[in-house]
Amino acid sequence: MDQTFQLVSDYSPQGDQPKAIEQIVTGIQNGKKHQTLLGATGTGKTFTMSNVIQAVNKPTLVMAHNKTLAGQLYSEFKQLFPNNAVEYFVSYYDYYQPEAYVPSSDTFIEKDASINDEIDKLRHSATSSLFERRDVIIIASVSCIYGLGSPEEYRDLVLSIRTGMEMDRNSLLRKLVDIQYDRNDINFVRGTFRVRGDVVEIFPASRDEQCMRVEFFGDEIERITEVDALTGEIKGERHHVSIFPASHFVTREEKMKKAIANIEVELEERLSVLRKEEKLLEAQRLEQRTRYDLEMMAEMGFCSGIENYSRHLTLREAGATPYTLLDFFPKDFLLIVDESHVTLPQVRGMYNGDRARKEILVNHGFRLPSALDNRPLKFEEFEEKVGQAVYVSATPGPYELEHTPEMVEQIIRPTGLLDPVVEVRPIEGQIDDLIGQIHDQIAKDERVLVTTLTKKMAEDLTDYLKEIGIKVRYLHSEVKTLERLEIIRQLRLGTFDVLIGINLLREGIDIPEVSLVAILDADKEGFLRAERSLIQTIGRAARNANGRVIMYADKMTHSMEVAINETKRRRQIQQAYNEQHGITPQTIQKRIPEVVQATYAAEETGDYKASSTSSKKLGKKERQATIERVEAEMKQAAKELNFERAAELRDVLLELKAEG
């Protein structure tokens, strides 16, 4: 297999890109540890980094600071590298409430989580790709610095089978159970296997469509085929297949026995400390919880919350650095930190928050002290694990400035687009002025982003604009990742014209259709109106030839002045380049992709709304006709075994009858 990166694109590097690519590639080849690409918004930083990846040909980890941006980057890299392994590694929780204890009210909050099966599959796909090939790009969120199992153990437990191999059926079944696969002859899903006579079908943890069918003749593997799990259609013959463990926290039996013995020793030591301190309730609680976990581990090889025992399972010393996704990469991997001014501070802050919560659990007998070693990396540990890094940002932070005094600048856009014109208008009458601007944009079939300071203001403004007939949506922190990507897609498609947000419209949100960004209360100094935030927000209008920004402010703050001056400086450089090369600015033409399957497939997208009009507006005869129609639809749906739709229609029917 060809293990080189192959960039597939209709474009070649333009403007500042060739120079930036050459500088970064030379830096990597010369062994530079840190480099920063200071790239203005819309200058094609992703395309530049793709060219760098192709040139240096190293396995690459691309870190983003949230799932939305990671999803967007995953889509882009997938298109640019269709022949290579582009993987996605983010937290697999749609919802996550870590276990916690509140001493003041004596409240223990059990861990509660909703795991996104699709993202779990992609995480397994990412780690297995790293062991199978070198042409791998993994797009990850900051969750990649959280503890995973030992990569050596994971690699050693890979089940390698080939045709002609001597192995009886029961040995294969035992080995599958050892690597956390469940036997399920009825519900055949990822991470399970089923048995039919001399045929074993295995559904790898990293797949969701194809399974492996292994056929035995006596004690020999006669045939291996790749099969569509749903239809049973044979997709191809395989002479060799590697089955990777179904859990990243997988341990061999002898190691598990050793780990259990070590946990028992730690438990006894901790119980004696708690009893000496007369913390009898805590001691009893700890003993009960830990003994239950030990029993599960001895019988099943697994328990709920097994990650809290990861130090023992990997036989590490107390306080030792945990294994993370970074350990699954070869030593010479390349790290690219996107929007580094936000991502690096996130990495820095992860350890302390996690530690504070776990210390309370340990002190009150909910966990053993070794649970403190199931943690994210400290920033110094993260630095040690990274060989070479490229930080990418339009507004580099203090860390980048300190480590890369000479930055690689990328200011010219391949499309000739200029940084937007920034205008300052008074706060008085800002909403009326904004409405006038919105109507102008809608007339030109262009979109508007509005950024406010508070959630309440965003909600009130959204309601007010809706009342006067403007198609508007509000993007807030409670909107799920998957929904957020869909909202941005709907804005691009023109389903609505105005998107309002607080801090969600800054880094990396790529919407070429937006030609106006309105910043309300721009003169209120603070995190949301700091110079970096303002430059990033201004950048949202830099992908459209008519891009402009209106700041509503009564005074010119230092942050506003810096942001406006930097925008002017870049605009002058861009204008001079365009005049010299006879370039006319053109809005970026960017395909509107389907929402990335990596983050969306686990969501149910079927629309089960009844086709009735609002019952409030119906007369008596119309209501009766609607009731009959909905009832007929409901019965038809039930006949077709479409029970979700039938249930939805039943609820509508009850409403209609209640109002009658």
From Swiss-Prot:
Domain notes from UniProt: The beta-hairpin motif is involved in DNA binding.
Full protein name: UvrABC system protein B
Residue span, Helicase ATP-binding domain: 26-413
A GO molecular-function annotation: ATP hydrolysis activity
GO biological process: nucleotide-excision repair; SOS response
Pfam families: Helicase_C, ResIII, UVR, UvrB, UvrB_inter
Intervals of motif Beta-hairpin: 92-115
